[in-house]
UniProtKB/Swiss-Prot annotation:
GO cellular component, one term: cytosol
Disease listed for this protein: Nemaline myopathy 6: A form of nemaline myopathy characterized by childhood onset of slowly progressive proximal muscle weakness, exercise intolerance, and slow movements with stiff muscles. Patients are unable to run or correct themselves from falling over.
InterPro entries recorded: BTB/POZ_dom (IPR000210), Kelch-BTB_domain-containing (IPR052392), Kelch-typ_b-propeller (IPR015915), Kelch_1 (IPR006652), SKP1/BTB/POZ_sf (IPR011333)
Kelch repeats: 159-209, 210-258, 259-305, 307-350, 352-400
UniProt gene name: KBTBD13
Protein name (database record): Kelch repeat and BTB domain-containing protein 13
Localization per Swiss-Prot or TrEMBL: Cytoplasm
Amino acid sequence: MARGPQTLVQVWVGGQLFQADRALLVEHCGFFRGLFRSGMRETRAAEVRLGVLSAGGFRATLQVLRGDRPALAAEDELLQAVECAAFLQAPALARFLEHNLTSDNCALLCDAAAAFGLRDVFHSAALFICDGERELAAELALPEARAYVAALRPSSYAAVSTHTPAPGFLEDASRTLCYLDEEEDAWRTLAALPLEASTLLAGVATLGNKLYIVGGVRGASKEVVELGFCYDPDGGTWHEFPSPHQPRYDTALAGFDGRLYAIGGEFQRTPISSVERYDPAAGCWSFVADLPQPAAGVPCAQACGRLFVCLWRPADTTAVVEYAVRTDAWLPVAELRRPQSYGHCMVAHRDSLYVVRNGPSDDFLHCAIDCLNLATGQWTALPGQFVNSKGALFTAVVRGDTVYTVNRMFTLLYAIEGGTWRLLREKAGFPRPGSLQTFLLRLPPGAPGPVTSTTAEL
């Protein structure tokens, strides 16, 4: 939204003078909103003095409110930012901290957020710790933080294979969501798909720990299923919701910033560029900015609270673009040119995007991975080749510092470290044939589901 002329206010913090847009402070900070609307004598003065905050923390606050992305790495920088987010009641700064959680700072942020009463940051940091290695929880200093993390359940790697709607009279036990039980090294059944649901060429994504399925097809004519389906693991229930206005299949679905995005896709065998956004609270879809070009099945990923997709362009080019919510526009980020090779899968870790691309001459068995650092804009090729047996690399999902991939033979876990993906351990393969869509879900406590039965390949 366009702003009018700025009214600057001078703010003294930690012995330093800052000039800030008054409207920006009122919009994003509950403290200033209350202060300027109170009619107190201080609000009519030329200056506001904040004696309890640090200059560094307030500087970071202003940077975030203006849309910048300050690098907060040192402990004192993080602590000062948490203090400012809590005192100034600045949700945008709190979200920035949540989006930049790493295994290096999660324990510090969890303790600090607990001490300052920053509930959302505390909860997000606790979830991150729960999904990471056990040593992370040991770094917590506050007993209440350790107890909170101990009461949480880690996310489970889950998958669904390709299924079309089933006739009501024909029960198909293979039409299920499944999850990996890492302790027992077995895939277990989580829930049966609704009879009308199709995962063939569907968009699948999670948002708010719920699974959404949009745009599957039935039949050789690729008739689009009319409804979307949402699974809530906490209640073990499905509910239906409207499909996008533009019928589409092979769409990329992303849960981002509290909304669901259906990105591109295909209809009547023609790629489309339109993008729609679903508001779960309102229960309706609305169009947002089109992709720069028509595209189906585009890889997408989120890093640092930002949404990215890969597009293919002539001359062996994979282009990474970002959706800017504030301006409703797709912005170019970077391009990667490799002979006869394009990005087919993209995942995010910290401030980097990892693009998995085929080898030359349509070699999909031996893939390469390139890393785009968003802070520097530089590409780095991971050393060696990665075996992509039965498309396992295209099922990649990141949890903490670990990449999960799966096919019929095994589930492989990789540690992201030292500029590469190091094979960490091997688990059971998915026991059913077909292309897989994978995701993370946090499952409620209770008896584990039955071990998933094996279905023979046709």
